[in-house]
């Protein structure tokens, strides 16, 4: 069985969790080649096994180079390993309260898929199936090439091709949210895990790149207040630690970060030319319940 066919078989098993982005009608998998809704809107599976469920083309500043750097930081440097272990424990503890399985977990804004892959690996729960959704085709192509277990979708979070009350958990890691859609697609008492940066997140990089200009300040409190308007806040966890990066890892950190987009070349060189450096990971993990 090819990788593409295996991916389509998994999609077919959970096809009832998805809907047509044009008409919101149900899908069926046709000839292990495409998705077709009741009004004959058709979407073909790509050779890597993902499917593009957007209704229009979109441009993204997040390109292949950025996603490759991000993958190396996550998978090789393990910069977020403590975060992944924390999230996986929350998921397993939460799913213990559900009498039925299988379980579907959505990573909303998954990028190249490494966060979802690591979380699922740490969960070690074969009853869980992951779905990664991102507007960036470059990210989803990379995810589908590297990680065969989850379902990968190019899709617009504002018009998500996901059915009502289909997902038990939504991950939203350092990515924009759409709480209205989150509430719609979560099962009752489903879990939202949102990760947001705190003031000291990557402070060493920010202090170098913005030494002579206004610094980027992260205020997680504003995000938490908005979050509480949509979900019952179950808990907030602060995760703060430092990790030493070598020069190659520093280059990856710069390449994966939008902070470098408007920075001076001299400031970027000042950071990446160091033999090594300590970087701070400072995050809030917001845990919300979809109470109805």
Model-derived segments and spans:
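A short acidic, Gly/Pro-enriched loop at the edge of an enzyme's catalytic core
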Residues: 158-169
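Conserved Class I S-adenosyl-L-methionine
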Residues: 14-16, 239-292
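Helix-to-beta-strand junctions that scaffold the AdoMet/dcAdoMet cofactor pocket
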Residues: 186-187
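Conserved alpha-helix/loop element of class I SAM-dependent methyltransferases that forms part
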Residues: 78-100
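Class I SAM-dependent methyltransferase SAM/SAH-binding core
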Residues: 104-107, 111-159
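Conserved beta-strand signature within the Rossmann-like core of class I S-adenosyl-L-methionine
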Residues: 190-199
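Class I SAM-dependent methyltransferase Rossmann-like catalytic core
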Residues: 8, 59-86
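N-terminal auxiliary segments of SAM/dcSAM-dependent transferases
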Residues: 2-60
């Amino acid at each position: 069985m090819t990788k593409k066919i295996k991916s389509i078989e998994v999609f077919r098993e959970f096809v009832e969790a998805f809907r047509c982005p044009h008409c919101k009608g149900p899908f069926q998998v046709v000839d292990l080649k495409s998705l077709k809704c009741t009004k004959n809107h058709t979407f073909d599976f790509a050779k890597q096994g993902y499917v593009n469920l957007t209704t229009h083309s979109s441009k993204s500043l997040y390109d292949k180079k950025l996603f490759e750097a991000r993958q190396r930081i996550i998978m090789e440097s393990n910069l977020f390993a403590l975060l992944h272990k924390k999230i996986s424990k929350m998921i397993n503890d939460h799913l213990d309260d559900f009498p039925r399985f299988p379980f579907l977990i959505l990573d909303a804004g998954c990028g190249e898929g490494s966060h979802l892959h690591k979380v699922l690996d740490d969960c070690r729960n074969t009853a869980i199936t992951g779905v990664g959704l991102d507007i960036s085709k470059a990210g989803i192509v990379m995810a589908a090439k590297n990680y065969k277990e989850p379902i990968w979708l190019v899709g617009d979070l504002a018009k998500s091709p996901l059915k009502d009350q289909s997902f038990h958990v939504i991950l939203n890691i350092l990515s924009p949210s759409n709480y209205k859609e989150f509430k719609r697609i979560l099962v009752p008492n489903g879990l939202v895990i949102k990760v947001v940066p705190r003031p000291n997140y990557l402070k060493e990089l920010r202090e170098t790149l913005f030494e002579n200009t206004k610094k980027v300040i992260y205020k997680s409190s504003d995000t938490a207040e908005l979050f509480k308007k949509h979900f019952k806040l179950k808990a907030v966890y602060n995760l703060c630690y430092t990790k030493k990066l070598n020069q190659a890892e520093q280059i990856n950190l710069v390449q994966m970060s939008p902070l470098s987009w408007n920075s001076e070349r001299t400031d970027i060189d000042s950071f990446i030319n160091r033999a090594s450096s300590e970087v701070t990971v400072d995050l809030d993990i917001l845990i919300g319940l979809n109470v109805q």
